[in-house]
Amino acid sequence: MENRWQVMIVWQVDRMRIRTWKSLVKHHMYVSGKARGWFYRHHYESPHPRISSEVHIPLGDARLVITTYWGLHTGERDWHLGQGVSIKWRKKRYSTQVDPELADQLIHLYYFDCFSDSAIRKALLGHIVSPRCEYQAGHNKVGSLQYLALAALITPKKIKPPLPSVTKLTEDRWNKPQKTKGHRRSHTMNGH
């Protein structure tokens, strides 16, 4: 019988970013209580030797599973040290992989207070309106003009520590163009 391969998307992430993300998840699960209902599975609870941890996030009758891996093949760069993250959406026996932006939007639908388009309607009906969005990573579009006007009136309050964003976890820090401070150039290069 032949080997049958399954391919899945795993974002290469450096281990310090994974470590920070895990500690943020644990903080909001056990200390702040904002991630109520989330389940953290340690590496020793998984039968798979490459799984470093799993975070199960209930989304109604479905769930989002964020799995971190270690001991993977290293990438083409020195800093690709064999760490990675995969994101799955599961409902009963069906599962599919999702990208980090969609994962953040799904988390935002079910968790964390938000000052969004519905705030305008709630304010008109006399309901209590949350003055800010706690989970900015869940927004990837510009709000309506009414929303932007209301948001301009209310100054956002920074949350310490920040909420665990899947997009932030998987972003590519290494291939971003470097920003340099000032105009430091060699005098011989520009002729002055």
Curated annotation (Swiss-Prot):
<keyword id="KW-0014">AIDS</keyword>
<keyword id="KW-1043">Host membrane</keyword>
<feature type="region of interest" description="Interaction with host APOBEC3F and APOBEC3G; FG-box">
    <location>
        <begin position="54"/>
        <end position="72"/>
    </location>
</feature>
<dbReference type="Pfam" id="PF00559">
    <property type="entry name" value="Vif"/>
</dbReference>
<keyword id="KW-0597">Phosphoprotein</keyword>
<feature type="binding site">
    <location>
        <position position="108"/>
    </location>
    <ligand>
        <name>Zn(2+)</name>
    </ligand>
</feature>
<keyword id="KW-0832">Ubl conjugation</keyword>
<keyword id="KW-0472">Membrane</keyword>
<keyword id="KW-0946">Virion</keyword>
<feature type="region of interest" description="SOCS box-like">
    <location>
        <begin position="151"/>
        <end position="180"/>
    </location>
</feature>
<feature type="binding site">
    <location>
        <position position="133"/>
    </location>
    <ligand>
        <name>Zn(2+)</name>
    </ligand>
</feature>
<dbReference type="GO" id="GO:0003723">
    <property type="term" value="F:RNA binding"/>
</dbReference>
<keyword id="KW-1032">Host cell membrane</keyword>
<feature type="region of interest" description="Interaction with host APOBEC3F; F2-box">
    <location>
        <begin position="74"/>
        <end position="79"/>
    </location>
</feature>
<comment type="subunit">
    <text>Homomultimer; in vitro and presumably in vivo. Interacts with viral RNA and Pr55Gag precursor; these interactions mediate Vif incorporation into the virion. Interacts with the viral reverse transcriptase. Forms cullin-5-RING E3 ubiquitin-protein ligase complex (ECS complex) by interacting with host CUL5, RBX2, elongin BC complex (ELOB and ELOC) and CBFB/CBF-beta. Within the ECS complex, Vif interacts directly with host CUL5, ELOC and APOBEC (APOBEC3F and APOBEC3G) substrates.</text>
</comment>
<keyword id="KW-0945">Host-virus interaction</keyword>
<feature type="modified residue" description="Phosphoserine; by host">
    <location>
        <position position="144"/>
    </location>
</feature>
<comment type="similarity">
    <text>Belongs to the primate lentivirus group Vif protein family.</text>
</comment>
<feature type="region of interest" description="Interaction with host APOBEC3G; G-box">
    <location>
        <begin position="40"/>
        <end position="44"/>
    </location>
</feature>
<feature type="compositionally biased region" description="Basic residues">
    <location>
        <begin position="176"/>
        <end position="192"/>
    </location>
</feature>
<feature type="binding site">
    <location>
        <position position="114"/>
    </location>
    <ligand>
        <name>Zn(2+)</name>
    </ligand>
</feature>
<protein>
    <recommendedName>
        <fullName>Virion infectivity factor</fullName>
    </recommendedName>
</protein>
<keyword id="KW-0862">Zinc</keyword>
<comment type="function">
    <text>Counteracts the innate antiviral activity of host APOBEC3F and APOBEC3G by promoting their ubiquitination and degradation. Acts as a substrate recognition component of an E3 ubiquitin-protein ligase complex: mechanistically, Vif hijacks a host cullin-5-RING E3 ubiquitin-protein ligase complex (ECS complex) and the transcription coactivator CBFB/CBF-beta to form an active E3 ubiquitin-protein ligase complex that targets APOBEC3G and APOBEC3F for polyubiquitination, leading to their degradation by the proteasome.</text>
</comment>
<feature type="binding site">
    <location>
        <position position="139"/>
    </location>
    <ligand>
        <name>Zn(2+)</name>
    </ligand>
</feature>
<keyword id="KW-0833">Ubl conjugation pathway</keyword>
<feature type="short sequence motif" description="HCCH motif">
    <location>
        <begin position="108"/>
        <end position="139"/>
    </location>
</feature>
<keyword id="KW-0479">Metal-binding</keyword>
<keyword id="KW-1035">Host cytoplasm</keyword>
<feature type="site" description="Cleavage in virion (by viral protease)">
    <location>
        <begin position="150"/>
        <end position="151"/>
    </location>
</feature>
<dbReference type="GO" id="GO:0020002">
    <property type="term" value="C:host cell plasma membrane"/>
</dbReference>
<feature type="modified residue" description="Phosphoserine; by host MAP4K1">
    <location>
        <position position="165"/>
    </location>
</feature>
<feature type="modified residue" description="Phosphothreonine; by host MAP4K1">
    <location>
        <position position="96"/>
    </location>
</feature>
<feature type="region of interest" description="Disordered">
    <location>
        <begin position="164"/>
        <end position="192"/>
    </location>
</feature>
<feature type="modified residue" description="Phosphothreonine; by host">
    <location>
        <position position="155"/>
    </location>
</feature>
<feature type="region of interest" description="Multimerization">
    <location>
        <begin position="151"/>
        <end position="164"/>
    </location>
</feature>
<feature type="region of interest" description="Membrane association">
    <location>
        <begin position="171"/>
        <end position="172"/>
    </location>
</feature>
<dbReference type="GO" id="GO:0019058">
    <property type="term" value="P:viral life cycle"/>
</dbReference>
<feature type="region of interest" description="RNA-binding">
    <location>
        <begin position="75"/>
        <end position="114"/>
    </location>
</feature>
<dbReference type="InterPro" id="IPR000475">
    <property type="entry name" value="Vif"/>
</dbReference>
<dbReference type="GO" id="GO:0046872">
    <property type="term" value="F:metal ion binding"/>
</dbReference>
<dbReference type="GO" id="GO:0030430">
    <property type="term" value="C:host cell cytoplasm"/>
</dbReference>
